[in-house]
Amino acid sequence: NLIRGAYHYYRPDEDPKLQAASYLRNTNLQKGDFLPILDVEKLPKQKSLEQFIADIQTWMDIVEKKYKRKPILYTYISFYEDYLYYHFKEYPLWVANYNNVAVPTSLFDWKMWQFTENGITAGAKVKIDFNVFNGDENDLKELLID
């Protein structure tokens, strides 16, 4: 079986309420799909760090209210460690780390690890992201919509 999902690339200088509304309007996640995923990769240019954190929390709260589960946070390990950990440690973590390591060396409990954006596989005409799951089948089910 193939598990599908939908992520939102967070734009830090834009309104988080409008971004969450757009995500909810344009996705139709079903039972068995991944929980909603928020991709946070950049700091804002026009907002303080405090406002940035508050805005991410606003997006998370709006989407969590709809699905009754905490969304998955996708980000780079260093970005998570530097800016997000203390505020979002209760959210499932999907990390990106392309540094040719056996496993990410993070003290944090990551659920998924995207280790390349240059994967090649049968049936795909372009390079794709490859990921590793950190857990067993029951752990995976925790990341899916009931």
Ranges and model annotations:
Residues 3-7, 36-38, 71-73, 93-96, ...:
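Hydrophobic faces of well-ordered beta-strands that scaffold small-molecule active sites
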Residues 37, 46-50, 54-55, 71-73, ...:
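Contiguous hydrophobic segments
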Residues 50-56, 80-92, 97-100:
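Conserved N-terminal glycine/acidic-rich loop preference
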Residues 88-146:
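Functionally critical loop-and-helix segments that line ligand-binding/catalytic clefts
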Residues 67-81:
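Aromatic-lined carbohydrate-recognition surfaces of secreted/lumenal glycan-active proteins
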